[in-house]
């Protein structure tokens, strides 16, 4: 994908609803752009800059490693503080965090995952829904989401897109994409 592809599907505001077929707002990434901003993990340019971000410390979440570039770590810290102040029943979705930095490609592709730039966090492994588990060929994807939309809204307020907004959904996945959400907020 190129830069125009990244903005092809407008990121929705408001309630979480089943996305239109093949609408994946914020899921497309241009590696050249992200390598320039965050570094290329395959060349060792990301890991050496990662910082420890406290993750919902009142709930015993420990720390997670995240990129400090472009305000990503600051944004995640703000998410953490807001989630920490949320209802106690959110804890089961937040602790433990299921993963942040991991220099890897997206399954079945040669494209680097957002985790490889240190800008993605996965939560709630036990309560996650993922399109591939329901329809590996992607022909009859049935939308499912068990993560409270209020949790997703916290991330979105701080510049993260949520995989529950994608037709090819990945409800545990949040990635720092201020370029996508900044455009959405201006409309």
Describe each region flagged by the PLM.
Residues 161-187:
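A cross-kingdom marker for long, charged
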